[in-house]
Regions:
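Glycine-rich beta-alpha junction loops
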Residues: 44, 126-128, 199-204, 241-243, ...
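Aromatic-enriched alpha-helical interface/lid elements that frame and gate functional surfaces
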Residues: 233-310, 314
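Short, surface-exposed beta-strand/loop micro-motifs that present aromatic residues
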Residues: 61, 232-238, 347
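N-terminal helix-loop segment corresponding to the beta1-alpha1 unit
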Residues: 1-178, 182-191, 371, 377-405
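Terminal low-complexity tails and localization/encapsulation signals of metabolic enzymes
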Residues: 1-13, 222, 238-240, 324-405
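Conserved PLP cofactor-binding pocket of PLP-dependent enzymes
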Residues: 308-332
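Active-site Gly/Thr loop motif
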Residues: 221-234
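Substrate-binding/catalytic subdomain of NAD(P)-dependent oxidoreductase enzymes
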Residues: 183-224
């Protein structure tokens, strides 16, 4: 049994026609669980993020591990025919093309369903069909329209984008739930189906309780920064090193005296303004100011240790680079090594894999992030094309291999 065959989705084949984050992330989740994922890219340029600077390269590398890449010209008849062959043999197709693009190319769900009635087709768009259905969608569009950006950041600073492509990633997660549901339903009926996942509706659901809050109270809540409206001492605080921060979360009656003891501030515990949860909320700004003044003299690691030893929720505010040296992630097997592209060179890289595990559920790092078209010949050979057919496609520019660019 091969490494992939031991994984839960080893019998699932996926064709991904994706760019940027949402579709690539969706297929990555399936790939980490063992699915055979073929990423279809445009010859010459590939995924948009391949040509979007270092941050784009990071996205391509981190989100396209465990996949094979074929560079295939879908504007050509022979390229579309090859794509049809791939989809005909696949269990799942995932795409995040613009509204109507797949249908205009003749590779949309209706086209592929005629070839493969069992196909599960995930389409990730900005919006579900409706008044906004034809609008272009991207992560910040969803964050803006859902209210997420308005609630992020500190009061008076204006709307702020979340520090990762959260609406893209969320739509991918919902999309994968839909794919797995459709595959389960196919076991009963033998039929595939169209699955719709969107950025705006995903972000809108997450903001649902704030919409309910506005409905209840008649007004929107202001942005929260790093705080929480239900708790008096729940924020990030700068320590004695510049730009080294700690989160502290005092959320129960037990946490409050434990916090005061841990930071050796019995005066705060004795202060009548902070005697009860309600009074602490009434004097939240004063309490936060007093805590900030005290914690500014603490070393970050010493403070976190003292609070955790006292049973008070606390955490260092890490930079992404610190994840790669995190003992917990290392010991739980969450950090993986692979090879990817950086500045025209191949380089050993690290990232965090899909965090799913169970008695018989594993995720594994198997394949490096592919070069554009690295597996074009291999993928078509798996689909029954002989060397002469493949050479002809290369000669006509329908497919591309890295050494022929």
């Amino acid at each position: 049994m091969t490494q992939r065959e031991a994984l839960p989705l080893s019998d699932v084949s996926v064709v991904e026609l994706g760019n940027i984050v949402s579709a690539p992330f969706a297929s990555l989740l399936l790939a980490d669980l063992g699915a055979d994922v073929v990423k279809v890219e445009r010859p010459g340029s590939g995924d948009i993020m391949r040509n979007a600077g270092e941050s784009g390269e990071a996205v391509v590398n981190a989100f396209n591990r465990n996949k094979r890449s074929i560079a295939l010209d879908l504007q050509s008849d022979r390229g579309r025919a090859a794509y049809h062959d791939l989809a005909e043999a696949a269990d799942v197709v995932i795409e995040n093309l613009g509204p109507g693009v797949a249908d205009r190319l003749g590779i949309g769900y209706d086209d592929l369903n005629e070839l493969n009635a069992g196909l599960v087709y995930l389409s990730i768009k900005g919006f579900q069909p409706g008044p906004y259905g034809d609008r272009p969608g991207m992560d910040m569009v969803a964050e803006a329209m859902s209210g997420l950006a308005a609630m992020t950041g500190r009061p008076g600073d204006g709307p702020v984008r979340v520090g990762t492509s959260i609406a893209d990633i969320g739509s991918a997660l919902y999309g994968v739930i839909g794919v797995l549901t459709a595959l389960r339903e196919r076991e009963r009926t033998g039929e595939g189906q169209f699955v719709d996942a969107t950025l705006f509706e995903s972000a809108a659901q997450w903001m649902g309780y704030w919409a309910t809050y506005a409905d209840m109270t008649g007004h929107d809540h202001p942005p929260l920064g790093s705080s929480h409206p239900a708790f008096s001492l729940y924020d990030v605080f700068e320590t004695d090193e510049s730009d080294r921060w700690v989160f502290v979360g005092v959320t129960t009656d037990r946490h409050w005296p434990a916090f005061c003891e841990a930071v050796d501030r019995p005066d705060l515990l004795a202060d009548e303004r902070f005697e009860t949860p309600a009074s602490r909320l009434d004097h939240k700004s004063e309490l936060t100011e007093a805590a900030a003044e005290e914690l500014a003299d603490w070393n970050r690691e010493d403070l976190v240790d003292a609070l955790l030893d006292a049973g008070v929720p606390a955490a260092p505010v890490n930079e992404p680079s610190e994840l790669l040296e995190d003992d917990h992630l290392r010991e739980t097997g969450m950090l993986v090594d692979f090879e990817g592209d950086h500045g025209g060179e191949r380089k050993r890289l690290r990232t965090v894999k899909t965090p799913l595990s169970g008695d018989r559920i594993e995720t594994e790092q198997r394949l490096d992030a592919p070069r554009l078209g690295e597996h074009s010949r291999e993928v078509l050979a798996d689909s029954g094309y002989d060397d002469a057919d493949i050479d002809s496609l290369i000669e006509d520019g329908v497919i591309e291999l890295p050494d022929e660019r």
